[in-house]
Amino acid sequence: MLIRKFRGVMLFSLLLGSANLLHAAELLKPFVLASTGTGEIVATVTEVKTKLASAGFELAGEYSPYDNVSILIVTSDALKAAAAKSDFGGYAAGQRVSVTKVGDEVQVAYTNPVYMAHAYRMNAKLQTTADKLKAALGSMKQYGPAEGLEADAVRKYHYMFGMEYFDEPSLLAEYKSYDEAVAVVEKSLAAKKGGASKVYRIDVPGKDEAVFGVHLTKDCSGDKFVMGHIDFKPVRSTAHLPYEMLVSGKKVYALYARFRIAINFPDLKMMGDNSFFKIMCAPDEIEEALMFAAGGKKVEDEDDF
């Protein structure tokens, strides 16, 4: 009898240990490939918009930063509510959906809400949003880096020693009030200061916070330049774009490129072809462009990648 009980306890312990190992082994990647097929960008975008609207998503903005791509930014009451409960949660108030033509193949993809929830240290997992996107658009696989990251690693991510974490943003400008900060950003983006223009704006309910998605076009800060060097794999990571500016209270912030790019391309090499070295000029140029877009002035920064 005692031996039988002991065997039962051992079996239960082994099963529990296996379950824990499976749970611990769950790995996340920044993007989800929804579908692939043939056709044209315009028709596919129209179809995707219809599916997203039927699933309850609101289109916050869209743009085509370079040929053969279209990017949609969607939000929902659930996303905005989750953003309101998290410090700097506005970064995740919109999820990005991309339609990319690579050769004869049209790829539909979107940001992985669960990955982004950890990347932006949200107080919500955004699993419901992930489920709704999957139901609306499909889910063939997560993708991005060759190897995924555990949730805790995403939440604490930085590319390497000396590079910024999520909670070390760039302060672009500061004003006397939230209303003034938002007004200046709107005006500066309309004037395309720094080569930046507005793609979308999402206001976070119940707090003085708004996130702006911006199209960057100037020199080394440009979307086309950066992606031309780092987005080279067969399945494109187009939904990395657009870059964000966050107005929170009286201040205007942006995530440093050394974090914002790396969190979506964590396995990008430091040197060689298709590496951070090829966009060495980008971090400072992006920060400068966003400072102008925030109504601020250029500051010198001695650091690059």
Residue spans for each PLM region:
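Hydrophobic alpha-helical segments and helix pairs
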Residues: 108-149
